[in-house]
């Protein structure tokens, strides 16, 4: 018994003879290519699987299987870099660049994470979309109230949820990690910033 899922819903799948030709090994949460017949059992649709194999990375688009931001990741990342480029304070700029420009592992995690499990922006790209929304509001407020330190406010808005890259697991799970359960994203993010600041 397996459960098949895409962004439209789930369906039960049955592999009646796991040792037959055409049934390749795969693990839970793998993207798989299946061939089979759809039947109805107890009022529900199920797929009797004849062939299955693990799909190669270039054979699928996660957007077809998981909730994804309607905004382009590349466009959002360009907007994020523009905000970073607008920060004039040398140290704050260096801090942002070290994380959002130089740290490829972090960038990949940030682009692919949600902002929450279910409450808001619970989809791939949700963390970046949420962060940009907060940063736009802060940018507006800094123009409306010139007494505000814009560089500090923009930096804080860009960094405020970075701990969520460690608090939540990546998709398709999008669930709390042990570290996330024990520490929470605010503490995790503060520690990440402290570690980065120590390198500047």
Name what the model sees in each region.
Residues 1, 9-12, 18-64:
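OB-fold single-stranded nucleic acid-binding module
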């Amino acid at each position: 018994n397996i459960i098949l899922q895409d962004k439209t819903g789930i369906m039960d799948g049955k592999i009646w003879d796991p040792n037959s030709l055409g049934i390749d090994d795969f693990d839970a949460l793998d993207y798989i290519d299946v061939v089979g017949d759809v039947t109805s059992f107890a009022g529900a649709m199920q797929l009797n699987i004849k062939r299955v194999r693990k799909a190669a990375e270039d054979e699928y688009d996660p957007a077809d299987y998981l909730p994804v931001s309607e905004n382009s990741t590349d466009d959002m990342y360009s907007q994020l870099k523009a905000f970073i480029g607008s920060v004039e304070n040398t140290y704050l700029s260096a801090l942002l660049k070290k994380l959002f420009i130089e740290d490829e592992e972090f960038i990949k995690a940030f682009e692919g994470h949600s902002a929450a499990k279910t409450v808001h922006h619970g989809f791939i790209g949700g963390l970046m979309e949420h962060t940009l929304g907060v940063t736009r509001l802060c940018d507006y407020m800094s123009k409306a109230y010139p007494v505000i330190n814009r560089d500090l406010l923009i930096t804080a808005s860009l960094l405020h949820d970075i701990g969520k890259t460690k608090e939540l697991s990546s998709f398709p799970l999008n669930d709390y990690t042990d570290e996330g359960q024990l520490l929470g994203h605010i503490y995790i993010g503060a520690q990440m910033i402290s570690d980065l600041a120590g390198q500047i």
